[in-house]
Amino acid sequence: MIPSFAVGRTQEMLYFIREIKAEHLVHGHGEFPVYVDSPLAVEATNIFRDHQKECYDSDAAALLAQGINPILFPGLKLSITSDESKAINFNETPKVIISASGMCDAGRIKHHLKHNLWRQESTVLFVGYQPSVHWDGR
């Protein structure tokens, strides 16, 4: 599970996950699905798709020139509805879930943590800023 900010960070993670999958760096699980589970993150990803010149840097543009989409790849699943979100947790195959709320204080990531954090094979990968003290003092 990757708690991530919906705009920018999610798309950056998709870029790196596409590279990991393309280089076959996850031995034994090369075809693992990747879920983007956030309506806002899905919309932002669609904006990146539709406005490639404005959104991509030179490395991503070079991939596009080769016919490779830098953030969309086989096995990527974009989840918008709450039913789609809930269904992710019933599928027990190895997967990556990128869900909004980079600080885990709101949104669907809380649902995924509740249903998966207890599982020994689960990992939470923090890819953004985490303050030592929450805004409300926790």
Regions found by a protein language model. Name each.
Residues M1-R138:
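Acidic/His-rich, metal-assisted hydrolase cores and their charged scaffolds
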